[in-house]
């Protein structure tokens, strides 16, 4: 298990710009992996440079992201895609909706796949029957109904980019 003391994010929520989302969570606890310790204290720095303290803690079969000033609870599940790459499912428990993205966890740093959603949706990444919507800030987003096409698209995208070119640093380990 790894502990990290600082979590640096480029947005006010962990996966705000996730390209894939669903009305209900698609990843179950039985399919999840648990790459972090039971409790992690972090400092988040938003795009304006404002820092806040928070905690990522394991609560039974999922992680809970406790954020000061936020009433809604955010739960996280991780699933290893390959090697140090994980799919992340972020669920807003008040709404029941889920966002999906990918992280790379190395011995000393956690990276978030950072890109405009329109970059991931090309002819090879189209998910038949799913709904696409245009967002003014993040480009396209996809309402997904199955986890497998999300896994495949994220794996393809991760294999085609270098971390320093397309990933945001989320945290560092002491």
How should these model regions be labeled?
Residues 1-8:
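Bacterial N-terminal signal peptides that target proteins for export
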Residues 15-18:
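C-terminal motif of bacterial Sec signal peptides marking the signal peptidase cleavage site
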Residues 20-37, 45-51, 57-174:
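Calycin-type beta-barrel ligand-binding domains and close structural analogs
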């Amino acid at each position: 298990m790894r502990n990290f003391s600082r979590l640096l994010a480029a947005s006010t929520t962990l996966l705000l710009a996730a390209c894939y989302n669903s009305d209900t969570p698609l990843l179950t606890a039985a399919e999840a992996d648990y790459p972090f310790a039971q409790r992690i204290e972090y400092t988040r720095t938003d795009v304006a440079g404002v820092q806040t303290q928070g905690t990522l803690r394991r609560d039974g079969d999922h992680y809970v992201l406790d954020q000061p000033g936020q009433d809604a609870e955010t739960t996280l599940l991780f699933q290893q895609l390959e090697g140090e790459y994980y799919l992340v499912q972020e669920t807003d428990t008040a709404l029941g909706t889920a966002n999906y993205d990918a992280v790379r966890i190395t011995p000393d740093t956690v990276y978030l796949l950072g890109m405009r959603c329109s970059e991931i949706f090309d002819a090879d990444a189209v998910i038949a029957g799913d709904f696409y919507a245009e967002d003014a800030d993040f480009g396209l987003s996809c309402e997904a109904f199955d986890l497998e096409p999300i896994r495949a698209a994220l794996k393809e995208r991760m294999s085609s980019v270098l971390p320093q070119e397309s990933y945001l640093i989320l945290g560092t380990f002491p």
